[in-house]
Amino acid sequence: MSDPINEHANEPASFPIKEHFQLKETIVTIAADNLAHIEAAKEAIRIHRAALETYIFSDPYFQLTLEPYECPENAPEVVRRMVKAGNTMGIGPMSAVAGTISALAVESMVKAGAKYAIVDNGGDIALINDRPVVVGIYAGQSTIKNLGLVFEPRGSITGVCTSAGTVGPSISFGMADAAAVFSDDVSLADAAATALGNEVNIGKESVEASFKAVKGIPEIKGALVIQGEYIGMWGQVPRVTRADVRYEYITKA
């Protein structure tokens, strides 16, 4: 899978430990200062993916629906987060699967003592960082290239998730080269990026109008859309910088 965001743009020579990890369809890049923190992320992915698979086996409709979904109160944590995010955006729960797995993995890393932790799950990124991190935006064939966003040091987890109609195999009904959403609720950022990307058609007016999909949701800090030669931003967007965005850095299946 090609994903529109790469957290290793402008990668310094002394970059912390980075590991590519695959568990069935889940393919992530994990970055941390300590191998124990990476192992914590991998174990969390194993646990929560297993819980999700068990739930889907009991109700296959969960995986198929593109509409809001109701789950029992005793559903696994991963399922409840996905349902809440999808319902908030008026779409199906699988729209939040990658961001939710990323968030749960980083939460486990923090419990293990990490102050610097990044999990990139196909362009849906959860992170906590005690130093600046540049997230590079990959927007396929768009003429807008080498664009990065600076995430300043912070002591709590945040997320940046992306959707694209022109890049990668994920379901999108729009024409965005990249639609990114910023939120401390990483599950919501993932579902919202899907909803935002669905609204993007070709042209400047469509880019401007697409942000209606995410306005009015307090937990969403900001959003960015790239379509062809056009770029639009709404709300609080991290500082823009130039980044060396290389296709080979992208976490993909």
UniProtKB/Swiss-Prot annotation:
It comes from the Archaea. Disulfide bonds: none annotated. Belongs to the UPF0280 family. This is UPF0280 protein Mbar_A3697. The lineage of its organism: Archaea, Methanobacteriati, Methanobacteriota, Stenosarchaea group, Methanomicrobia.
